[in-house]
Amino acid sequence: MPEISGVSWYGFAIVCGLVVADFVLGVARAFVQGGYRSSELCRGLARKGAFIAVMLLAAYLEWGATVWPPISALATLPLFDAVAVGVAMIELSSIVENIVAINPDLADAPFWSHFSSKAIKNK
């Protein structure tokens, strides 16, 4: 991997793993609920691709800040880390939501109940 100051490629790999896990669980959820549609699959893949693109853009900006003086002020900001943490939080909440949808018995458990469809609709 290329060395870019401030960019953790381990973080990128972890977030990509979360994206794949969310995708697999989302497909499983669709099959379990009988609502599998290729249009939803394409929309979900586009969303995942956009997350990856935003992370790569943040890494590119961090690299650009080290070689192009007009944007050197960006070099002090942890852009990639902030974006990666944000995407990871979105993916983790989606993974938990998919798990609860696949196994509705979890919806009554104290922690998992926050991620059930009923809890989301009541907010």
Predicted regions and their residues:
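Membrane-proximal cytosolic segments adjacent to transmembrane helices
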Residues: 73, 87-123
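Juxtamembrane helix-capping/reentrant segments at transmembrane boundaries
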Residues: 36-51
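Alpha-helical transmembrane segments of multi-pass membrane proteins
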Residues: 15-25, 51-59, 83-94
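Membrane-helix exit/interface motif
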Residues: 28-32, 56-69
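Alpha-helical transmembrane segments of integral membrane proteins
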Residues: 8-12, 46-50, 77-87, 97
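Membrane-interface helix-loop junction between the first two transmembrane segments
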Residues: 14-40
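Short, strongly hydrophobic alpha-helical membrane anchors
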Residues: 1-9
